[in-house]
């Protein structure tokens, strides 16, 4: 895969593909399962796949979130590599002529006024002008036969379709269904802004849309009835601040009084400070089915030629390490404690007086330190680890290291160095890896992904018991505060933030024994092997 940043390099590569079918997937990065569904379809239908990653300043208003929009270049690179993308085009604003300081004097593409009278356009003046300008630029640079856009951004889709039609651009715009989580929430990069409570509130957007759809399916085609049904559902969630709820024609975006053939029921609402949009097509074809929990709990078949990898992620204190060790022992797989690697670098930095905000020194430390890991003699004992020949197995579990490890792990250079080592160890499969971004970044192609979680109180108690066993006394309240602070750091960092992979199986360990959690994962692994007919792997 090539990662290109300049127009010249992109043009040179595209020219070499002359005579082949090229597909374009335009994105703003911070990739998730919605983007990956577009990429997979593009790869199925085209000889070459180009993914653009560009957080477009021209489509953000003065008080919007351009400066804090999620960016995860390392994670995006790994996902694109795993998905088989040929080229990622990731220019900066200057390369695209989109520097806000000088953009006022550039050529703009103005969508038809009739498409800007409803939905998001009145609330985001200039937004779709910025979208249309950059999309036209990308179509001109890549000259794809096909370009893939998600139905979730329905107004954008309608505008791009009209743009291509009016300007006679020889590109087929391919609409792709909205991809949702099990509770209906549409995948969005802005979902990262949501707290756990806000995440539950956000799920009511889909419930409201579905209520309107069901009302239409029951035989009432009137906009009044459909909107009233959706609105009644929204009123059950007062935490939502609805910006608009509208029923329009999917192509013209003009308001409908009734749905005769097709309609677009669309919503925008604020959950806390986060603005979310969603929509449903009201059409005879019906609504795309939600992913069922039973389906999401069935892992995909393992990659040919390697034993399956198990990726276990989750917040501090969720029980990842002890569970991963035990699962690896039961299945006779290699266990790799990635967290111990970050702890070792943190401990060394503290010992040597390296400032924890000095990214350059920390990166150099990670690159130069020789780390040696060895599984403990039993599943009950932690991984033994040596840093430059000195065993630091116990030292890296100190409260001071625990306090600072997430800050060190957030340094891009440190992550890059350690992830390279982790990938070398796990590339042949047959391993259990645990951490915070194994399934989303280190091994996004892992065959089995698990996300363990537990309440702050439960995790604090577990940590207290660990420390007491080591002869250390720390109050429960202090541990709770440390865990909450670490959760914030891990989930809000820009580089590989803590989040479940889209296809991860979530296990809440609050009311489960360790043995019960282990049993769940072992059964899922064996189920994976049975589905693939992989008896030749000779696991236990």
From Swiss-Prot:
It comes from the Bacteria. HAMAP family: Cytidyl_kinase_type1 (MF_00238), PanC (MF_00158), PanCY (MF_01349). It comes from Synechococcus sp. (strain JA-3-3Ab). GO terms for molecular function: ATP binding; CMP kinase activity; dCMP kinase activity; pantoate-beta-alanine ligase activity. The keyword Phosphoprotein does not apply. Residues 281-540 are annotated as: Cytidylate kinase. Catalyzes the condensation of pantoate with beta-alanine in an ATP-dependent reaction via a pantoyl-adenylate intermediate. Catalyzes the transfer of a phosphate group from ATP to either CMP or dCMP to form CDP or dCDP and ADP, respectively. The keyword Nucleotide-binding applies. Its EC number is 6.3.2.1, 2.7.4.25. The gene is panC/cmk. This is Bifunctional pantoate ligase/cytidylate kinase. One of its GO terms (cellular component) is cytosol. Beta-alanine binds at residue 59. Keywords: ATP-binding, Cytoplasm, Kinase, Ligase, Multifunctional enzyme, Nucleotide-binding, Pantothenate biosynthesis, Transferase. One of its GO terms (biological process) is pantothenate biosynthetic process. It is found in: Cytoplasm. Residues 288-307 are annotated as: Disordered.
């Amino acid at each position: 895969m090539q990662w290109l940043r300049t127009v010249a390099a992109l043009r040179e590569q595209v020219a070499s593909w002359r005579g082949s079918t090229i597909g374009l997937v335009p994105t703003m990065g911070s990739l998730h399962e919605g983007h990956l569904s577009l990429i997979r379809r593009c790869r199925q239908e085209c000889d070459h796949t180009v993914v653009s990653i560009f957080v477009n300043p021209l489509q953000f208003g003065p008080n919007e979130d351009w400066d804090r929009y999620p960016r995860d270049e390392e994670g995006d690179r790994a996902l694109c590599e795993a998905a088989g993308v040929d080229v990622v085009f990731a220019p900066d604003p200057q390369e695209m002529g989109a520097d806000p300081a000088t953009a006022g004097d550039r050529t703009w593409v103005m969508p038809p006024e009739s498409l800007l009278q409803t939905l998001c356009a009145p609330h985001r003046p200039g937004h779709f002008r910025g979208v249309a300008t950059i999309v036209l630029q990308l179509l001109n640079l890549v000259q794809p036969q096909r370009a893939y856009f998600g139905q979730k951004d329905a107004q954008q889709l309608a505008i791009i379709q009209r743009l291509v039609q009016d300007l006679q651009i020889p590109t087929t715009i391919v609409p792709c269904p909205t991809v949702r989580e099990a509770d209906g929430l549409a995948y969005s990069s802005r979902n990262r802004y949501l707290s756990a409570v806000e995440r539950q509130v956000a799920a009511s957007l889909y419930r409201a849309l579905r209520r309107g759809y069901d009302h239409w399916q029951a035989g009432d085609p009137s906009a009044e009835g459909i909107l009233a049904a959706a609105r009644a559902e929204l009123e059950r969630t007062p935490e939502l601040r609805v910006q608009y709820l509208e029923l329009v024609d999917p192509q013209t975006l003009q308001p409908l009084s009734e749905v005769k053939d097709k309609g677009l029921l669309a919503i925008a609402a604020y959950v806390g400070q986060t603005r979310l949009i969603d929509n449903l097509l009201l059409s005879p074809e019906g609504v795309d089915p939600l992913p069922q929990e039973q389906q999401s709990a069935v892992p995909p078949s393992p990659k040919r030629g390697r034993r399956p990898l198990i990726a276990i992620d989750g917040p501090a204190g969720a029980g990842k390490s002890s569970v991963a060790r035990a699962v690896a022992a039961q299945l006779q797989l290699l266990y790799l404690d990635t967290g111990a690697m970050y702890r070792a670098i943190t401990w060394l930095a503290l010992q040597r007086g390296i400032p924890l905000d000095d990214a350059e020194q920390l990166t150099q430390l990670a690159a130069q330190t020789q780390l040696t890991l060895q599984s403990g003699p039993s599943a009950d004992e932690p991984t033994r680890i040596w840093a430059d020949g000195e065993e630091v197995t116990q030292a890296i579990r100190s409260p001071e290291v625990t306090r600072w490890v997430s800050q060190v792990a957030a340094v891009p250079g440190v992550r890059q160095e350690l992830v390279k080592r982790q990938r070398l160890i796990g590339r042949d499969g047959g391993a259990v890896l645990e951490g915070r971004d194994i399934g989303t970044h280190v091994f996004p192609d892992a065959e089995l992904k698990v996300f363990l979680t537990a309440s702050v109180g439960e995790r604090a108690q577990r940590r207290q018991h660990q420390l007491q066993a080591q002869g250390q006394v720390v109050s429960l309240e202090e541990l709770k505060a440390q865990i909450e602070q670490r959760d914030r750091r891990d989930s809000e960092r820009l580089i590989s933030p803590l989040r479940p992979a889209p296809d991860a199986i979530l296990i809440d360990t609050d009311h489960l024994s360790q043995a019960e959690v282990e049993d769940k994962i072992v059964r899922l692994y064996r189920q994976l092997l049975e589905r693939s007919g992989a008896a030749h792997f000779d696991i236990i």
